[in-house]
């Protein structure tokens, strides 16, 4: 059976034919613009290509006008670190000595709601291929997860499937999962967030970019065969929110094969080493349509593609289906004719399917696609790649003043009971139920991962040079004040890297928001972008790349605005990375609190746990103080252990440092704040709890003073196994038991964990 195509000639002959542009996610004005570009109606294949490439996911059409602010705030000094920046598959930074690091965060939110396991698994696979496409070896992954209420039935369906998908794919690839964050909130019910981060390493001279150059060069498709999975994944899932009772969108969810990707990684690295690749692009969202049109648009000529040569795993696929398929584990390379044979030999060695599917031509800005010997696409690739740019209206919501009114702070009858309630809350409880499903130490280069502020990896076995990576974000803070919320996410990720002893070096982000057609959401988005861009400039670290995910809402209710910020740091010797846990030295430790504590409970976990809702202003952060903390920790060998203060404040930081070794801690809250509740649970920014041996105390206090960092001795450790404060006492083991039980009790017997949404 031969598929009948809608050809270019047929499109010219049938100008009045009705087309399903709306079902493909296009607006009337967008369809009209396509007709204007082509001078005729588009073919089915052209309509598919434009709908995919003009989706929010691929075109950034609603966010692009605001994202330009990142470029406007990047100084020459900041830019000098970047080898590849915004617009590439992933940001790449030069960290000196000929080494480069690439890292990026990508969202796979909507697919993970529809089919949790495959949605999350292919999210990991996609971000890993982004890193591969830069010429790098992927070395680790992280994940940022957001779910509905922890006790909601649908959370019990989604969370176990997502966690299994992340672990199943990442573990099979042999990549350590070195950290992450899991948050529960009502706003994510029906729209979970699954943001995956990957980091890779390469030599500076091995950098690869996505472009098709050189007349006569061949376009090679390699990896898995192309099937029907993921058809329309970008345009259907990336540009639509979930309505109550809406028909499930399972056909648009991709299916991953991590073992095929593991082989593809090694195949790519050998192809790079052999010098046979001119340009490279992974096939992710938008599939072959996206990969080939982007390569053509970035080159100095044109491209001809023959879909008859694409290896298929389904029969009778149309041109539109082949172009839009989001089958996983595929890459597209541009190769000179004299290297094609070598390219094929390497692919054959790794048992990777490859095919020559096209050629670079000297006809600039042309993109021709043939199927069954017929021309089905004839369009300028620049118009496909650039897409429309919208100046969406935005306005500060009327409810913003009301939500920022000073909250009434709940006062507990017992501080000990409040402490127990905090550590056992889903917001702060142990994530071991999740993280124990991930392999943290595969490959043997993980230095810090479990219960660490950031993941630390060795990247050079000879010099012990390494990197530290952290990713953070607070939707609660960002809803109260989007600009400050983004700054706080940046500050926490920066601080998490700094407390390991690494020097923060670069930033990436994943901006998760509701519908861009909502003026409130667009105001939140603009404010968050400005907060992150201005904050990065103040810290003098560049934003190397990012991702935007819109339409995260159920019906008309958007999620909490959630900018996830990743920070990469460099450490000269990973063996000198600072410890997280107390009890690591053979004598009592003195505890020192760096930074100033204020009564700041807006958006805090205490406000959430005590039933205070979401009210007030978030903590205020002066990023100059974060930079001072980084200066304090770099090269500091006097610190025995360190932990940043964030969610839950001093109490949670002290418990998390003490629990592993069952250390006793005696805290003096009076030197922190006159109010014991504030001293325990305030979430003031720019604070770190450190410990040191007594003979290093004076030197540490002097160093803090020289840098202008407030520092007070807040306590000491002992072998009692109890945490004492304000005349109260609670056993560390009792807190640990409550802390450890929450997630297993909620999800240990979840039913239907991998079922699709009905």
Swiss-Prot record:
Gene Ontology biological-process entries: 'de novo' IMP biosynthetic process
Source organism, top-level taxon: Bacteria
One family name in Pfam for this protein: FGAR-AT_linker
Main location: cytoplasm
UniProt KW keywords: ATP-binding, Cytoplasm, Ligase, Magnesium, Metal-binding, Nucleotide-binding, Purine biosynthesis
Pathway(s) it belongs to: Purine metabolism; IMP biosynthesis via de novo pathway; 5-amino-1-(5-phospho-D-ribosyl)imidazole from N(2)-formyl-N(1)-(5-phospho-D-ribosyl)glycinamide: step 1/2
Self-association and partners: Monomer. Part of the FGAM synthase complex composed of 1 PurL, 1 PurQ and 2 PurS subunits.
Name used for this protein in its record: Phosphoribosylformylglycinamidine synthase subunit PurL
Binding site for ATP: 60, 104, 509, 546
Lineage of the organism: Bacteria, Bacillati, Actinomycetota, Actinomycetes, Mycobacteriales
Residues forming the catalytic site: 57, 108
UniProt-annotated binding residues for Mg(2+) 1: 106, 547
Main function: Part of the phosphoribosylformylglycinamidine synthase complex involved in the purines biosynthetic pathway. Catalyzes the ATP-dependent conversion of formylglycinamide ribonucleotide (FGAR) and glutamine to yield formylglycinamidine ribonucleotide (FGAM) and glutamate. The FGAM synthase complex is composed of three subunits. PurQ produces an ammonia molecule by converting glutamine to glutamate. PurL transfers the ammonia molecule to FGAR to form FGAM in an ATP-dependent manner.
Family from the record: Belongs to the FGAMS family.
The EC number(s) this enzyme carries: 6.3.5.3
């Amino acid at each position: 059976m031969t598929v009948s195509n809608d050809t270019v000639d047929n499109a010219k002959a049938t100008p009045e034919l009705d087309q399903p542009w709306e079902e493909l996610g296009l607006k009337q004005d967008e369809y009209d613009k396509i007709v204007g570009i082509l001078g005729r109606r588009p073919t089915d294949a052209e309509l598919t290509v434009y709908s995919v490439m003009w989706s929010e996911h691929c075109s950034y059409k609603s966010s692009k006008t605001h994202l330009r602010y990142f470029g406007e705030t990047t100084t020459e000094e900041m830019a000098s670190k970047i080898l590849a920046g915004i617009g590439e598959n992933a940001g790449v930074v030069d960290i000196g000595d000929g080494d480069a690091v690439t890292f990026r965060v990508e969202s796979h939110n909507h697919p993970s709601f529809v089919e949790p396991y495959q949605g999350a698994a292919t999210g990991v696979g996609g971000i890993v291929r982004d890193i591969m496409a830069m010429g790098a070896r992927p070395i680790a992954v992280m994940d940022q997860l957001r779910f509905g209420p922890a006790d909601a039935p649908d959370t019990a369906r989604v969370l176990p499937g997502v966690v299994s998908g992340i672990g199943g794919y990442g573990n099979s690839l042999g990549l350590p999962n070195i950290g992450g964050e899991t948050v529960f909130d009502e706003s994510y019910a029906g729209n979970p967030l699954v943001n995956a981060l990957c980091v890779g390493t390469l030599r500076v001279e091995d950098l690869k970019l996505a472009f098709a150059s050189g007349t006569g060069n061949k376009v090679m498709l390699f990896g898995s065969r192309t099937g029907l999975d993921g058809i329309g994944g970008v345009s259907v899932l990336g540009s639509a929110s979930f309505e109550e009772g809406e028909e499930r969108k399972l056909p648009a969810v991709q299916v991953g094969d991590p073992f095929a990707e593991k082989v593809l990684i090694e195949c790519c690295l050998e192809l790079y080493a052999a010098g046979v690749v001119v340009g490279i692009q992974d096939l992710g969202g938008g599939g072959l349509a996206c990969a080939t049109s982007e390569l053509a648009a970035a080159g100095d000529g044109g491209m001809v593609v023959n879909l008859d040569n694409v290896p298929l795993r389904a029969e009778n696929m149309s041109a539109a289906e082949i172009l839009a398929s989001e089958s996983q584990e595929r890459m597209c390379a541009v190769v000179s004719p004299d290297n094609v044979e070598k390219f094929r030999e390497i692919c054959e060695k790794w048992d990777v399917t490859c095919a020559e599917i096209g050629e670079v031509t000297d006809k600039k800005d042309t993109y021709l696609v043939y199927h069954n010997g017929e021309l089905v696409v004839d369009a300028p690739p620049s118009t496909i790649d650039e897409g429309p740019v919208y100046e969406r209206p935005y306005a500060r919501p009327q409810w913003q003043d009301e939500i920022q009114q000073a909250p009434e702070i709940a006062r507990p009858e017992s501080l000990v009971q409040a402490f127990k309630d905090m550590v056992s809350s889903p917001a702060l409880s142990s994530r071991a139920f999740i993280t124990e499903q991930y392999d943290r130490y595969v490959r043997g280069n993980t230095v810090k991962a479990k219960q660490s502020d950031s993941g630390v990896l060795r990247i050079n076995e000879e010099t012990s040079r390494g990197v530290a990576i952290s990713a953070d974000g607070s939707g609660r803070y960002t809803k109260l004040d989007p600009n400050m919320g983004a700054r706080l996410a940046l500050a926490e990720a920066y601080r998490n890297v700094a407390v390991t002893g690494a020097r923060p070096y670069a930033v990436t982000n994943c901006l998760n928001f509701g519908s861009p057609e909502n003026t409130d959401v667009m105001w939140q988005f603009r404010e968050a972008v400005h907060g992150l861009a201005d904050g990065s400039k103040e810290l003098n670290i560049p934003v190397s790349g990012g991702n935007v995910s819109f339409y995260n809402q159920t019906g008309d209710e958007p999620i909490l605005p959630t900018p996830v910020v990743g920070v990469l740091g460099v450490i000269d010797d990973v063996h000198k990375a600072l410890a997280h846990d107390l009890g690591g030295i053979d004598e009592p430790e003195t505890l020192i609190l760096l930074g100033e504590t204020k009564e700041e409970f807006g958006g805090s976990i205490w406000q959430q746990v005590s039933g205070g809702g979401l009210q007030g202003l978030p903590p205020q952060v002066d990023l100059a103080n974060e930079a001072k903390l980084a200066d304090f920790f770099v090269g500091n060998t006097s610190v025995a252990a360190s932990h940043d203060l964030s969610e839950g404040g001093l109490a949670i930081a002290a418990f998390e440092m003490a629990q592993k070794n069952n250390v006793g801690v005696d805290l003096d809250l009076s030197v922190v704040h006159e109010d014991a509740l504030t001293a325990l649970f305030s979430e003031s920014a720019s604070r770190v709890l450190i410990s040191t041996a007594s003979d290093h105390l004076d030197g540490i206090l002097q160093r803090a003073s020289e840098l202008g960092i407030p520092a007070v001795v807040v306590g000491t450790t002992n072998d009692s196994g109890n945490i004492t404060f304000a005349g109260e006492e609670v056993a560390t083991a009792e807190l640990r038991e409550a802390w450890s039980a929450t997630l297993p009790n909620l999800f240990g017997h979840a039913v239907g964990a991998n079922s699709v949404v009905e």
